[in-house]
């Protein structure tokens, strides 16, 4: 069983990542491909980024500086002095739910072995891969050597990595907790796995529907639940009960598992 999450645009650059698992920190597996993309990004002025990414002037200035500061080579690897593990750098609703800062060593190692974080710049990351701050959403139409967008750039590479990481998995099930924008980067027909997509619905005025803020946090919570309980197969996820959610069989099918939360528990 292997989980996929989207990254976050908001980053936590202040809190220090725990050092008791520093021996598990690693370099991104597709970093040489990241270099090719960063070469393109470094050539762009703030005004170019503002137009490309539809961001404010302040954000374009910030990310232009991040791009210029970004550096990786065989002689200049990411370290805890110039980078931070992805699972601790990414912030926002999903990562509030995942809550890696409060995990013990064994739980963080489980997450590292069972979770891939899709990324516009890094392809797919382990949570304990060092990365430097960036902004590049998967849906960005950044022309590159492989095509007009990042889906053309990453598709095959990301899919190969996911298949490799799932090779030793007992049940060959991919739990897709990523957004549509990011999961679109995966070539589904080339995956050697069954795909299950959890859906989180909250009750509002007697109706159950996906509420983005709650659903994002629930995605992180589901990975946390699997890690806390050291789950070994997908079927065990049906017992997921954090934050008041429960599996709803009548609203589920083989490919989409629906978890609901009643209004009284929100």
From Swiss-Prot:
InterPro entries: YaaA
GO cellular component, one term: cytosol
Pfam families membership: H2O2_YaaD
GO annotation, biological process: response to hydroperoxide
Similarity comment: family membership: Belongs to the UPF0246 family.
Protein name (database record): UPF0246 protein Pcryo_0542
Natural source organism: Psychrobacter cryohalolentis (strain ATCC BAA-1226 / DSM 17306 / VKM B-2378 / K5)
């Amino acid at each position: 069983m292997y989980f996929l999450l989207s990254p976050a645009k908001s980053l936590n650059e202040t809190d220090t990542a725990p050092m008791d698992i520093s021996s598990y920190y690693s370099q991104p597996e597709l970093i040489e491909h990241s270099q090719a993309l960063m070469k393109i990004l470094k050539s762009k002025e703030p005004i170019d980024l503002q137009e490309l990414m539809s961001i404010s002037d302040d954000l374009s200035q910030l990310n232009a500086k991040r791009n210029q500061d970004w550096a990786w080579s065989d002689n200049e690897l990411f370290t805890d002095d110039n980078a931070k593990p992805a699972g601790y750098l990414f912030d926002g609703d999903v990562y509030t739910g995942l809550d890696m800062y409060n995990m013990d060593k064994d739980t963080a190692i489980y997450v590292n072995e069972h979770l891939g974080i899709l990324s516009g710049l890094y392809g797919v990351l382990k949570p304990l891969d060092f990365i430097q701050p960036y902004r590049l959403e998967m849906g960005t139409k950044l022309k590159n050597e492989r095509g007009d967008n990042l889906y053309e750039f990453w598709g095959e590479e990301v899919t190969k990595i996911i298949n490799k990481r799932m090779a030793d998995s007992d049940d060959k099930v991919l739990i897709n907790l990523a957004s549509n924008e990011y999961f679109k980067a995966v070539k589904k027909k080339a995956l050697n796995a069954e795909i299950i997509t959890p859906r989180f619905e909250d009750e509002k005025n007697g109706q159950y529907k996906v509420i983005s803020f709650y659903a994002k946090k629930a995605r992180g919570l589901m990975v946390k639940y699997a890690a806390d309980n050291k789950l070994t197969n997908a079927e065990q996820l049906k017992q997921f009960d954090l934050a008041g959610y429960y599996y709803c069989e009548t609203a589920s099918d083989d490919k989409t598992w629906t978890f609901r939360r009643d209004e009284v528990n929100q």
